[in-house]
């Protein structure tokens, strides 16, 4: 309705090489385009708060100018909006701290490779692929998010090496939420090069999909104990799982009408 599209410039060769945490060769800008006129209108430089800006999500409400970006390497969520003067503004609203690890020379970044906004624009979900946790934030006030849920699966911190009896080689990566906001499906593979770099056992074990039960009214998350898909046992496997979609629509493909 507002004919605006947002794009990020996370890197030129990031998919084909190892993730070099100490390098500064990655993108840190957001670009806004007038989709009707097909021309760029704004570029936001995010600096160190926006290293490897990856997923961008607007509110589903087409009258809203609010949107969010997950900066993967900084492990931050950037919030943007248009002010009363029609100018685009941005701020960092979530900052996931790096965590120490005995085998790493530097603290481990979360690597926030995905974000998602619920259909009612009430909750924002994010992952920390290297830490191993999924989070739910109430964004009723998009300037002041509140953490309302957190679960652990895999990751390098050792908080949940097994889920529903299955050892996880990887961490929470892509995820998809049902339109009613109650079922969140999470998979574990990012890119094969990064998978092999940080989770080499995924070559033999394959990927996993779990389901998280979400409370869309009061907030909260818990791993469903009766659901798990082991892609390591697929024919001609082990296989890896990246992204999922709902045939009847989901919170990524649908908007308000």
Where are these regions (language model features)?
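Single conserved hydrophobic/aromatic residue that forms the stacking wall/gate
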Residues: 2-15, 113
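Conserved beta-strand position repeated across blades of beta-propeller domains
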Residues: 57-59, 116, 176
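Beta-rich catalytic cores
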Residues: 26, 52-54, 111, 171, ...
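Surface-exposed loop and turn segments in beta-propeller and other repeat-based domains
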Residues: 40-51, 88-108, 148-167, 224-257
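Short, conserved, GDST-rich strand-edge loop motifs in beta-rich repeat architectures
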Residues: 11-26, 70, 77-80, 187-206
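Short coil/turn segments that connect the beta-strands within blades of beta-propeller domains
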Residues: 63-65, 120-122, 180-182
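Short loop/turn segments immediately following beta-strands, especially the blade-tip
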Residues: 32-39, 79-93, 136-148, 199-201, ...
């Amino acid at each position: 309705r507002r004919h605006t599209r947002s794009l990020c410039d996370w890197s030129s060769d990031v998919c084909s090489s190892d993730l070099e945490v100490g390098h500064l060769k990655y993108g840190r800008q957001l670009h806004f385009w007038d989709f009707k006129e097909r021309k760029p209108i704004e570029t936001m430089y995010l600096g160190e708060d926006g290293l490897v800006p990856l997923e961008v999500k607007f509110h589903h409400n087409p009258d809203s100018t609010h949107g969010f970006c997950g900066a993967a390497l900084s492990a931050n969520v950037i919030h943007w909006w248009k002010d009363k003067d029609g100018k685009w503004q941005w701020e960092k609203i979530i900052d996931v701290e790096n965590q120490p690890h005995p085998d790493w020379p530097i603290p481990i970044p979360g690597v926030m490779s995905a974000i998602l906004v619920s259909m009612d624009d009430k909750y924002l979900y994010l992952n920390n692929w290297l830490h191993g946790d999924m989070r739910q934030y109430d964004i009723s006030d998009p300037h002041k998010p509140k953490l309302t849920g957190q679960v652990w699966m895999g990751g390098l911190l050792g908080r949940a090496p097994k889920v529903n009896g299955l050892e996880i080689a990887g961490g929470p990566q892509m995820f998809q939420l049902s339109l009613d906001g109650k079922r969140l499906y999470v998979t574990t593979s990012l890119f094969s090069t990064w998978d092999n770099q940080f989770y080499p056992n995924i070559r033999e074990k394959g990927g996993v999909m779990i389901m998280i039960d979400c409370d869309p009214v009061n907030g909260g998350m818990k791993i469903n104990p009766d659901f798990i898909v082991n892609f390591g046992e697929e024919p001609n496997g082990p296989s890896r799982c990246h992204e999922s979609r709902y045939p009847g629509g989901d919170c990524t493909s649908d908007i308000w009408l």
